[in-house]
Each structure stands twice: as C-alpha cells, then as structure tokens.
C-alpha cells in the first residue's frame, strides 16, 4: 500500500474488531468481517449516523431540502391512493341504477321526450328504497325487465290512496329506457323469447305461457293479434281469464270468438293458435307499437276499440303516459273549461272509448266535484221520445247510466249506446263549463301591445262563451262583439276604427280587416325608438332656441332700458346747464345786474328799492333723529 499515491507517510495499523466496541456497520448493524485495516488517519474510528438521523438533520439544517422531501412524500401517497382506487373500481359491478347515473344526461333527455322531469336524488331513492317494497320483484339496483317495470307502473298509477303520483315521471322514464333502449342500455335489456308456433296450429296443443298474467289495476284489455306475413295471428284463448287493470271486476264485455275451423281468417291468413298471452296489457300495447303496423281494416292501434282481423272489435286501454300528459299539459276544468272540453271531445271522437274508458278519462282530468257536475248536466240533457228533455228516471238511466252497463261493443246496439253516451257526456261538459254571467270579465279582455287583432278577437269570443250565456257567433250578437272589439282594442287601432266612415254598416269581418291593416302599418320597435330619439332631439333643439331667443330679448330690453336711463341723465345735465346759463346771463361791463340797463351798476340802480335789509332766512339742518 505504500506505492499507492497519496499514502506516503501513512501509518498502517491492523486492529482487531474487539478493540472497538463502538464500531457499527450499515444502518447500525455489526460488521461481517473479522477485522479491518485503517488506511488513512490517526487510527480512530468515527461513528456515522443511520439514514433516519441523517434525514432529520437535513430537515433541520437545510431549508431548501424541506419542499423536496414534502414533494416526494406527497407523490408516494398519491400513487398509493391511485393504485388502491384503480384496483377497487375495477372490481365494482355495473348495475342498471349505476348505469343510469353514469348516463344521466341521456336519462334527462328521455324524460324530456316524455314531457316529464326527473331528479337524480329522487331517482335513486325510488329505485333503491321505494319500488323494492312493492313486492313485484324489483331489485334494489334496478332492472330493465319490461314485466317488472309494468308491475311497478301499475302500482304507481293505482287510484286512490294506494297510488304514488309523485313517482309517475320516474317510472315512465324508466319504462321508456326499457322500451326504446339507448345503446348503453341494450346490453342490459332482457331479450324477448321467440314465439315458437307449430306448423299446423289446430292439431297441436298450445305452448305453455311464458308468465302468469299479473293482477293489474286499470281496465280489462284484450291483446290484439300481431298480423305479420312470417307469423300468423296470436289471439288470447277464448276461455282464458280477462286481465283486470283495476281492483274492480271486469266489465261484461264479450270475449273474442274462437278461430274458424277451416283455419282461414277474413284476410285469408292462417288461423291463429292459442299463444301465450302477454304478461301485461301495457307491455303488449307497447310491443305492438314497436312492431310494424298490421295490414288489416284499421290503421290505428291506439284506440280503445279497433276492428281486428276476425271482424270483432279488440279492446285497447288508454296509455297511462297519455293520461298523465293530458292532465299535466292542459289547464284544469275550472280554470279553462273550453280547452279541456275540446280535448275530451277530440278523444271521444277519435278513440271511441267504452263506458269504463270514459270514467277513467273523467277521473283523471276532472276533480270529484267537477265530475259530479258534468254527470248531472249530462243526465239533464237526456231527451225523451218527444225530443224534449225528460225527467223519467228509467229513460235517463238507460241513456246515461251511472253504473257499468251491459253494452257489448261487438254488437251494433251496444255501439249505438256508446255513441249516444259520448254525445250526452259532451253536452254535459259544455253545460257544466258555462260560468255565471260576468260582463266585467269580458270588458277586462284588452288587446296586448304586440297581439294581432285576430288573436284578440278569439280571446274576446272565448270570454263571451265563458262568462256570458251569449254565443259570439250568433248574428244577433255581432253588434255587441263589434263594439267590444273597437273599444277594447289597442288605443291607436281603436281611435282609427272609431273614425271609419259608415261605421254602423261595417261587419265584424270588415273591422278585423281594417284593424289588421292598421296593425301591419305599425312602426317597428327600431322605428319607434328612432322616432322617439328624433322627437327628443327636436324638442331639445326647440327648447335651446327658445332659451336663446328669450336671452336675446332680455338683453335687448336691458339695453333699451339702459339707453333710456343714459338719455335721461344726459338730457337732465343739458337742461341744468341751460338753466344755469339763463339764470346768470352774461353782463356787460356797464350793465346793471338788477335792471339789466346800461349806464350804471346794480348798487346805483334807481329801480332797486332802498331801505333796511331784512334778516336772511336761516336754513334748517335735519339730524338723524328727525
């Protein structure tokens, strides 16, 4: 070792380990070798601190090292948390409820298409806490099974205290997601099992049903046949039970007859076999909407009564979502009876509802008191054989019964009863919607600033129908309506209509046309703003010119007064000078100042009186006290 550079003069001493009890190895561990050799130094062994003591000393001595140490510790902590969360999230199972929460924007869009609004917190509460208590098989994590959704929907739409109106938007939205699933729902939707039919339907026994028909709470519904070319019609068994959608007994409507023995229907297709009925009338109705339309005698599948392929009427109940939308998108009967009457009239004419459907429609859209008033007015409208309103209870109960009648809609007599019942119901709605006469309400209808005359006239006529017993379309009331139209129009239109020539011979249509011309010639808001600005500028200019004119007139008057004053002063001074000169005329050197004669002076004037001079009058001075 003496040849090693830099070690000349060093003392090399070999000492055993036992002589240095304070020697430590790495991290304070004892050394592994038996001994060691000190190459450089005085032979003393220095004790080096462990890494923990080194870090603490660096932390206390170096200020710059503190942020570095904190950053390292924070990075290690974040990395550990990230790895832990990634591992746990990867193990979380996806459920229908969590799927809807992850795609909440799509759920809100679906609810908006159904004309309803949903909230995320209530969505989670109903799905995980409320609907599992209905005992229909709803899991706490949700499901897209149409059968379970339909059962929950029936519970929600139950009438009376057992219903849940606040949950209607949520179950309707959930049903819409299952019926028309978005791409992220399709993997979770239960596929429909294919309907297997034997080649010869009459000779083989029917297939077992897929599920038992649930106990529902609306009205009975007979599933309609699905008439497509590849598959024959599937009608419910003629001996099977009807599905009850309310807690009441089913109406005595006749079941559809069995298929013809020859296996041919009216349209020449293969005779239907006894297939498995749908699990719910709502599911069958929605399924019928999703599939292609049937090529038979009818084109609508939404009517309660429609003609099936076998020549018999099929019953389709109202959709609960339709009833919900009708109720929430229209004013109440007390608020606007005309609008709700028009809605019910269109439903009665197009949907051809049965007696039970009419009761369901009235119970949904009207309150209890409104419904009783409508039924009372409808029974008053029943006419006897002489064509006048009758008071016979039997005739009234036959035409407009309050209990479920035995009317078969598959017979002409039953359909005639239903048509007459709908007409009486419509008359009751119209009579019950008439309010007591209140002309003040009619006078309170005025034309808005931007309302067209035609729209204003419609509102005015509606007020006449609602608050008066008069018909505004009656020619005898045209004069009253015309006067109201003129007086209650906008001020500019009313003034010009009052100045029309031959006003008394003008019809209401002529007045409306003139009002439309005046309305269309109105200036736009931009033109009105420009006109107001221009008028303001002109008014300001006129005011400024008037102020200048008044100032000039004031200056001119002041100048005139000053001129008069100066002229007066100058003339007074001139008069004073002229008066002084007259009092003291210039005398010659030999002229008498007393008699103005020449030849002597005033003291020698013979004309001057002689005698003692009287005392001079003393001038009195005024003091401040005087």
Swiss-Prot record:
Pfam families, per the entry: Gag_MA, Gag_p12, Gag_p30, zf-CCHC
Membrane listed as a keyword: yes
Localization (cell): Host cell membrane
Entries under InterPro entries matching the protein: G_retro_matrix, G_retro_matrix_sf, Gag_p12, Gag_P30, Retrov_capsid_N, Retroviral_Gag-Pol_poly, Retrovr_matrix, Znf_CCHC
Keyword Glycosyltransferase in record: no
Chain positions of all zinc fingers (CCHC-type): 590-607
Top-level taxon of origin: Viruses
Membrane topology: Single-pass membrane protein
Single GO molecular function: zinc ion binding
Post-translational modification: Glycosylated by host. Cleaved by host near the middle of the molecule, releasing the c-terminal half containing capsid and nucleoprotein domains op GAG.
Protein name: Glyco-Gag protein
Source organism of this protein record: Friend murine leukemia virus (isolate PVC-211) (FrMLV)
The organism's taxonomic lineage, starting at the top: Viruses, Riboviria, Pararnavirae, Artverviricota, Revtraviricetes
């Amino acid at each position: 070792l003496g040849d090693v550079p830099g070690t000349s003069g060093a003392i090399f001493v070999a000492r055993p380990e036992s002589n240095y009890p304070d020697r430590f190895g790495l991290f304070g561990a004892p050394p592994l070798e038996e001994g060691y050799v000190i190459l450089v130094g005085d032979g003393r062994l220095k004790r080096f601190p462990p890494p923990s003591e080194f870090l603490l000393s660096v932390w206390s001595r170096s200020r710059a090292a503190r942020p570095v140490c904190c950053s390292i510790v924070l990075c290690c902590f974040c990395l550990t948390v990230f790895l832990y969360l990634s591992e746990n999230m990867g193990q979380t199972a996806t459920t229908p409820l969590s799927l809807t929460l992850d795609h909440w924007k799509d759920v809100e869009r679906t609810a908006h298409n159904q004309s309803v609004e949903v909230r995320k917190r209530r969505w989670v509460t109903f799905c995980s806490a409320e609907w599992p208590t209905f005992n229909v098989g709803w899991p706490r994590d949700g499901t897209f099974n149409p059968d379970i959704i339909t059962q929950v929907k029936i519970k929600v739409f139950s009438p009376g205290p057992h219903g849940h109106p606040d949950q209607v938007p949520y179950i309707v939205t959930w049903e819409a997601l299952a019926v028309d699933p978005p791409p992220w729902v399709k993997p979770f939707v239960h596929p429909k099992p294919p309907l297997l039919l034997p080649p010869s339907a009459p000779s083989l026994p029917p297939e077992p049903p897929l599920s038992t028909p649930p106990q529902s709470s609306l009205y009975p519904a007979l599933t309609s046949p699905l008439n497509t070319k590849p598959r024959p019609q599937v009608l419910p068994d003629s001996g099977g039970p009807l599905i009850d959608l309310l807690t009441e007994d089913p109406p005595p409507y006749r079941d559809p007859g069995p298929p013809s023995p020859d296996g041919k229907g009216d349209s020449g297709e293969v005779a239907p076999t006894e297939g498995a009925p749908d699990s719910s009338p709502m599911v069958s109705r929605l399924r019928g909407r999703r599939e292609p339309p049937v090529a038979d005698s009818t084109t609508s599948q939404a009517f309660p009564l429609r003609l099936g392929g076998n020549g018999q009427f099929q019953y389709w109940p109202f959709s609960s979502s339709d009833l919900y939308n009708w109720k929430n998108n229209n004013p109440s009967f007390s608020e606007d009876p005309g609008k709700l009457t028009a809605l019910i009239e269109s439903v009665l004419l197009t949907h051809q509802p049965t007696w039970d459907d009419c009761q369901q429609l009235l119970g949904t859209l009207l309150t209890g008191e409104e419904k009783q008033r409508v039924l009372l007015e409808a029974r008053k409208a029943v006419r006897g054989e002489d064509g006048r309103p009758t008071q016979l209870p039997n005739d009234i109960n036959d035409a407009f019964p309050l209990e479920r009648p035995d009317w078969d809609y598959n017979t002409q007599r039953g359909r005639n009863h239903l048509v007459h019942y709908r007409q009486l119901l419509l008359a009751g709605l119209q009579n019950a919607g008439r309010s007591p006469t209140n002309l003040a309400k009619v006078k309170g209808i005025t034309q808005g600033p931007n309302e067209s005359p035609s729209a204003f006239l419609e509102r005015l006529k509606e007020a006449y129908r609602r608050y008066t017993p008069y018909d505004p379309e009656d020619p005898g009331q045209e004069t009253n309506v015309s006067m109201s139209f003129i007086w209650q129009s906008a001020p500019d239109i009313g003034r010009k209509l009052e100045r029309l020539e031959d006003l008394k011979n003008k019809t209401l249509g002529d007045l409306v046309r003139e009002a439309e011309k005046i309305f269309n010639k109105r200036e736009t808001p931009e033109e009105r703003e420009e006109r107001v600005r221009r008028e303001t500028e002109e008014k300001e200019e006129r005011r400024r010119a008037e102020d200048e004119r008044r100032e000039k007139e004031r200056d001119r008057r002041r100048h005139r007064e000053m001129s008069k004053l100066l002229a007066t002063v100058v003339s007074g001074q001139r008069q004073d000078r002229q008066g002084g000169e007259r009092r003291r005329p210039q005398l010659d050197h030999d002229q008498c100042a007393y008699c103005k004669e020449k030849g002597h002076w005033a003291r020698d004037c013979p004309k001057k009186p002689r005698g003692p001079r009287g005392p001079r009058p003393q001038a009195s001075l005024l003091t401040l006290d005087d």
